[in-house]
């Protein structure tokens, strides 16, 4: 059986570029077919409504993942309304502001995954250009991957795939990814590696707070420019901590790897030269 997965990307968070790729890292899975629709950087209600309706009415997947910033904003709110009435199981993946509508999403019959270490970018014109945007997202992706947050998202979606394959009702995830949940998912062997990953996660959480201050709470350019610049320096160092954590695990030949089998089963290994089982 091939499970058809629909992914809607409106706007961008750090998880957005990799959420589909994490399900099929070598492009050799035979049990899934992924279809992605998006509205680029925009997440206004009209753009979101267009792609969400197209996913529901034309693609008609077995389940839908909607991913983007701030699930409480007007655009994502429109998507939630459409998805809750579609009859198709759906999950909202978002950043920390989504905590404000966690209960509302549950009442709408939607699943959710809130990623607390996926921070807002420093979106001030004097500071943010395409290069800075790309560097920031590259650092965030490293933090998501190295702390375990990415693995939690991937495994939650894999469980939904398993349910469809087994003919069972999909149990929609209701997950808030905290630092403790993330590092547990990474199965660190070296306690110092775990500590570095925890530090990276916590710094990434604070990056969002600093960027909110710089983007929405500070009006003077001479004040908000260094504020958002400081947030980007923070995420750069969080990414360095993740690299250091992984190097410690490499030194012990204990990096946790969980590749997919072509039939979809999750395999596991730690020693570099052993086969995953």
Swiss-Prot record:
Enzyme Commission code: 1.5.98.1
GO molecular function term, any single one: methylenetetrahydromethanopterin dehydrogenase activity
Which GO biological process annotations does it have? methanogenesis, from carbon dioxide; one-carbon metabolic process
What start and end residues bound the annotated signal peptide? none
The segments labelled Disordered in the record are 252-277
Alphabetically list the UniProt keywords: Methanogenesis, One-carbon metabolism, Oxidoreductase
The pathway entry for this protein reads as:
One-carbon metabolism; methanogenesis from CO(2); 5,10-methylene-5,6,7,8-tetrahydromethanopterin from 5,10-methenyl-5,6,7,8-tetrahydromethanopterin (coenzyme F420 route): step 1/1
Q: Which domain of life is it from?
A: Archaea
Q: Which reaction equation describes what this protein catalyses? A: 5,10-methylenetetrahydromethanopterin + oxidized coenzyme F420-(gamma-L-Glu)(n) + 2 H(+) = 5,10-methenyl-5,6,7,8-tetrahydromethanopterin + reduced coenzyme F420-(gamma-L-Glu)(n)
List the Pfam families hit by this protein, alphabetically.
Answer: MTD (PF01993)
Could you tell me what this protein does? Catalyzes the reversible reduction of methenyl-H(4)MPT(+) to methylene-H(4)MPT.
Q: Which NCBIfam families match?
A: PRK00994.1 (NF002162)
Tell me which HAMAP family the record gives: MTD
According to its UniProt record, which protein family does this protein belong to? Belongs to the MTD family.
* Protein name as annotated: F420-dependent methylenetetrahydromethanopterin dehydrogenase
What is the organism field in this record? Answer: Methanocaldococcus jannaschii (strain ATCC 43067 / DSM 2661 / JAL-1 / JCM 10045 / NBRC 100440) (Methanococcus jannaschii)
Q: Which gene encodes it?
A: mtd
């Amino acid at each position: 059986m091939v499970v058809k997965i629909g992914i809607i990307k409106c706007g961008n968070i750090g998880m957005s570029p990799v959420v589909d790729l994490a399900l099929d890292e070598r492009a050799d899975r035979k049990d899934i077919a992924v279809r992605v629709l998006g509205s680029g950087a925009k997440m206004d209600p009209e753009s979101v409504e267009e792609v969400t309706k197209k996913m529901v009415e034309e693609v008609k997947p077995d389940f839908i993942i909607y991913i983007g910033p701030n699930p409480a904003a007007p655009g994502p709110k429109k998507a939630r309304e459409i998805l809750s009435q579609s009859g198709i199981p759906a999950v909202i993946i978002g950043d920390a502001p989504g905590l404000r509508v966690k209960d509302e999403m549950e009442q709408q019959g939607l699943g959710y995954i809130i990623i607390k270490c996926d921070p807002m970018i420093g979106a001030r014109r004097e500071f943010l250009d395409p290069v800075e945007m790309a560097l920031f997202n590259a650092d965030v992706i490293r933090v998501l991957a190295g702390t375990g947050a990415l693995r939690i998202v991937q495994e939650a979606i894999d469980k939904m795939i398993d349910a469809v394959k087994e003919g069972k009702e999909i149990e929609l995830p209701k997950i808030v990814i905290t630092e403790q949940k993330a590092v547990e998912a990474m199965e660190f062997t070296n306690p110092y590696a775990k500590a570095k990953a925890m530090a990276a996660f916590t710094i990434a959480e604070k990056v969002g707070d600093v960027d909110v201050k710089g983007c929405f709470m500070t009006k003077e350019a001479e004040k908000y420019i260094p504020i958002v610049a400081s947030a980007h320096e923070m995420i750069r160092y969080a990414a360095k901590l993740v690299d250091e954590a992984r190097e410690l695990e490499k030194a012990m030949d204990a990096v946790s790897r969980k590749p997919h089998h072509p039939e979809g089963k999750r395999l596991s290994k730690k020693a570099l030269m052993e086969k995953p089982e």
